[in-house]
Amino acid sequence: MSTKFICLKNVMAILLSINILSCSSSNSSIEELPYLTVKSVSPQNLAAAGGEITIRVSSYPIATAQSDAGWITLKSNTSSDSLTSFTFTAKANKGNAREAGITITAGEKETIIIITQAANNEQESKPAIDENLPAVKVAKELGLGWNLGNQLDAHVNEIADETSWGNGKVTQETLLKVKQAGFTSVRIPVTWLGKVGEAPHYHIDTDWMNRVAEVVEYAEKAGLKAIINIHNDGHRHIHEDGFDEHRWLDIVGAAQNKDMNTAIKEQLKSMWTQIAQRFENKGEFLIFEGLNEIHDGRWGSGTNTTDGGKQYAILNEWQQVFVDAVRATGGNNATRYLGISGYCTSPNLTIKHLQLPTDPAQDRLLISVHYYDPATFALEDKFAEWGHTGAPSKKESWGDEEHLKKVFAALRTAYVEKGIPVYIGEMGCVHRNNNRSEAFRKYYLEYVCKAARTNGMAVFYWDNGNAGAGRECSGLMNHTTGTYVNNGKDVIDVMTKGYFSNDPSYTLESLYNNAPQ
């Protein structure tokens, strides 16, 4: 073999090695981004007898799954490339209707699939409740309520500002018209951001307190029951880029840091002491609601599921601080009705984790929850139809009439039948731009109101004043003049029928049988 050939061979080998190393280096720098897509869930709504649930997902990295309830257990899972199939076994249900979450995780990606199971004795179809029960009488006095949304709860640059979200100033005429329309109560959400001084006094701005008091006066003169609260001071939102937007009522921080929790409780005590003192002489028409939608930004499916109950315990502490602060001011506040809400005001999480505060006043606490199920229909307008007559391709795969009945029946069993009044502090459904979709919207709202009355609860529509159509457009009445927005009168009429009709032939069943076709 010649020296030239040997050298040429060596050069070729070196070049080949360089090429291989180059390719290897290039390939290793291309990393697949994590993703998670749910392909199918079958079935998502279980019969009482139980059975198997199959969930198929596509993901990178390979997904894992875990149930948050003991009655659903993982039986097996198989993976091939990016596809994973999970099989769960659900036990037979011997009690009330129930639901559970199955968390699917792939790297940093996570989703929760809600599985529902019917009651073994159809308790979701309970007859109308005895309206002579004390808790029902209280709820019935609140009746059908209207939220003055995106008003005193609005804020810009972390400062509360009544007109910053598009509504003009609310007037006495507004609430007179609300009463005339058929509502019996008004919930007045209040944000206090930028209106509170530094520690240790946390003095509330006098002008802002006066404006809140002025709107409460409007409600009183209109003959409406009224609820005021601390609203967006606890708002939290996790943005798509991961940015965690939150404010001083930081449930995550408080659960991790005792000093932060102590500081939050001191501010909460000071603020509710001042609010209660300002309204000490107001009569029973006025209710205080301590907090609103406190959560970690994931709406009940975040770190609250993995922190061993710390956030639930912190929220229970905050609610106790609220009750103690109000009661200590005396006067009418010694026995004023107070609204208590659980984690993110979820009915399910409230029932599971809320510990009702100790209260020196007897039977003066109310439970507040919110209901927008399914949010993809009620809030986001991703689906145009709802209920058993909706086209499968145009409605969400869960959250129909049976789900609603189960949720309300569970609240009835947990609270109303035990003497604790319940009000649905927020519910609603956004306006659509066509008659067919509006028919399903009105059916949904009528059904919610009828189900609330049937189960002995009050219910409040969320009106944010937005006169458009689509996502977050839930205006029924102009917030300055009280005039109707779009088909607001028609929508209010079906809700008042749903809540107030005493016709014995008008039931949830008859309403169901007359759903839009």
Give the label of every model feature segment.
Residues 434-517:
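Aromatic-rich peripheral "rim/lid" segments of glycoside hydrolase catalytic domains that contact
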